[in-house]
């Protein structure tokens, strides 16, 4: 029987509680045997802003998932050159697992709605399932997806409501810069790592990053 593997790709700059909620709810709802967290080495959709060093993002993700045995960290995108396209990553995972796994790409509805802009999206959708995570009560419009992907949209894209989706990495970085607390937004180990390394502060700002 094939294993069911979830893929949590992202910049994780930083990883936060919503990432963990999404991964765990997806694992439970779709009976996933494992969820792979894959920090993007060179994300194609983040070319317009500076991204924190991969080593920091990788280590923060490692700290975030340490308490869950079903979560695994992968550096598969660091090991290759070029932009971190999801299709290339999925194909590499298929080679690693051979024919022994079905993959479920976990992402937010904003990304699902922009799926037609991704690198070779039809090939990607044919290669793995997608779990589109929505906020509680948010409507799901499948008309555009069916227009772009036809039958594949019905067969390959699933939807899952998850609470706590209001947390964002962008807001956490802002809060650190402004000296506001980020406790309960990120795991304690990640909070301490950000403080220790002085991440997300303006250049030359050596003050304590946040109050807790």
Task: Give the role of each language-model region.
Residues 1-212:
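Nucleotidyltransferase catalytic core that binds NTPs
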């Amino acid at each position: 029987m094939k294993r069911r593997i979830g893929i949590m790709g992202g910049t994780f700059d930083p990883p936060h509680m919503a990432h963990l909620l999404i991964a765990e709810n997806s694992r439970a709802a779709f009976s996933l045997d494992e969820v792979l967290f894959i920090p993007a080495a060179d994300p194609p959709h983040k070319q317009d802003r500076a991204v924190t060093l991969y080593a920091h993002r990788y280590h923060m993700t490692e700290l975030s998932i340490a308490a869950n045995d079903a979560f695994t960290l992968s550096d598969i995108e660091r090991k290759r050159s070029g932009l971190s396209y999801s299709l290339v990553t999925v194909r590499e995972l298929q080679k690693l697992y051979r024919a022994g796994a079905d993959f479920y790409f976990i992402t937010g509805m904003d990304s699902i709605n922009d799926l037609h802009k991704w690198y070779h999206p039809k090939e990607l959708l044919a290669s793995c399932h997608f779990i589109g995570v929505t906020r509680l009560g948010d409507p799901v419009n499948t008309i555009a997806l069916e227009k772009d992907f036809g039958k594949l949209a019905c067969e390959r894209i699933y939807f899952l409501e998850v609470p706590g989706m209001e947390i964002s990495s962008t807001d956490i970085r802002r809060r650190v810069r402004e000296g506001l607390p980020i406790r309960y937004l990120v795991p304690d180990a990640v909070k301490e790592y950000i403080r220790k390394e002085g991440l997300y502060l303006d250049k030359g700002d050596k003050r304590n990053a946040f109050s807790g």
